Regions:
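Nucleotide 5′-phosphate-binding alpha/beta core
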Residues: 1-93, 99-131, 136-140, 144, ...
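Active-site glycine/GP-rich loop and adjacent strand/helix microenvironment
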Residues: 2-28, 49, 152-263
C-alpha cells in the first residue's frame, strides 16, 4: 500500500522533472544558436529575459497568451529552430474552414508519439508485421503520417485512401447532403477495394462514423470486418462514447466488448 510520504516523494520528483524539462525547452527555443526566428523575434519584445528568468514550470506564466492567428500564413520556416536546420521538415494543417489554415511545423514528434503509443497496443489484436489500412483524412494531416509510421514501426505496410475533410465541410455547409453521401460512399468503396484485394490487412485506423459505414458497405457485399481479416481497430478523431463502443463491438464486429480488438 502506498504511503502518504511515498506519494509526496513521487510528486516532488515529478515536479522537479517538469521544471527541468521546462527550463531545457525554454533555453532551446530562446537561445540565439538553437531558437527559431519566430521565438527569437518574440523574445525581443518581452519585458523579461526567458533565458535567465524562466527556471521552472510556474515561470511560464510570465509569457503572454499564445495567439492562434500566429499559426496562419507564412513564412512557415520561421518556426523551424536553428538547432534543427537541415533536417527533413513537415507541415501539417488544420481544416482551413475559417480562412487560411493554421500550420504546424513538425520534424520528429509524430514518430516519437506513435512509437510510444505502439508499446501500448496488444499484439493479440495488433500483431507485429501486420499491414494496416488508414481510413481517415489524407493530405496535410499529421494523423495520416502518424498512422503510417505506427504501421511501419511495427513492421507492416500502410494502405491509405483519398479523403479530403475540407470538401466534406463544404458539402455540409452548402447543405448538399446527397453529394455528401456519395462522397462517403466513394471513400468506403476505396477502403473495400483495398480490404478485398488480398493485401492481408489485419489492423486499421478510422473514425467512428467511417467504421460504421465500412461495416455496412462490407455487409452489402456479403462480407464483414471480421471476414476480411481485421483483428485490431484504432479509432478516434470524433466522439467515441461507451454506448457507441458497445454497439460497434457487439453489432458491427460481432463480439463481446471485453474480447474486442477495438482500441
Amino acid at each position: 500500500m502506498t504511503t502518504e510520504s511515498e506519494v509526496a516523494t513521487s510528486a516532488t520528483a515529478a515536479r522537479e522533472k517538469l521544471d527541468a524539462h521546462t527550463y531545457e525547452t525554454v533555453q532551446w527555443h530562446f537561445h540565439e544558436s538553437t531558437g527559431s526566428p519566430f521565438w527569437l523575434e518574440k523574445k525581443a519584445g518581452l519585458n523579461f529575459d526567458p533565458l535567465t528568468e524562466v527556471k521552472c514550470f510556474d515561470d511560464l506564466k510570465k509569457f503572454p497568451l499564445f495567439e492562434d492567428e500566429w499559426l496562419r500564413g507564412g513564412p512557415v520556416r520561421r518556426w523551424v529552430p536553428k538547432g534543427m536546420d537541415g533536417q527533413p521538415t513537415y507541415v501539417f494543417e488544420t481544416g482551413g474552414t475559417t480562412g487560411i489554415p493554421k500550420s504546424r511545423v513538425v520534424i520528429d514528434d509524430f514518430r516519437i508519439d506513435y512509437e510510444m503509443f505502439s508499446h501500448t497496443l496488444p499484439d493479440e489484436y495488433f500483431p507485429k508485421g501486420a499491414n494496416w489500412l488508414m481510413l481517415g483524412p489524407s493530405g496535410p494531416r499529421r494523423l495520416r503520417l502518424a498512422v503510417e509510421h505506427l504501421c511501419q514501426f511495427r513492421g507492416g505496410i500502410s494502405f491509405c485512401i483519398d479523403l479530403d475533410p475540407r470538401w466534406v465541410v463544404k458539402l455540409i455547409k452548402k447543405g448538399w447532403m446527397d453529394h455528401l453521401e456519395e462522397y462517403k460512399k466513394h471513400c468506403i468503396d476505396q477502403a473495400v477495394t483495398i480490404l478485398t484485394a488480398g493485401h492481408d490487412i489485419k489492423c486499421m485506423f478510422t473514425t467512428p462514423k467511417l467504421l460504421e459505414s465500412l461495416a455496412y458497405g462490407l455487409a452489402e457485399r456479403d462480407t464483414s470486418i471480421q471476414e476480411v481479416g481485421i483483428t485490431g481497430i484504432f479509432s478516434g478523431g470524433t466522439e467515441f462514447t461507451p454506448q457507441w463502443t458497445r454497439f460497434c463491438v457487439e453489432e458491427l464486429l460481432g463480439g463481446p466488448t471485453e474480447e474486442s480488438g477495438v482500441y
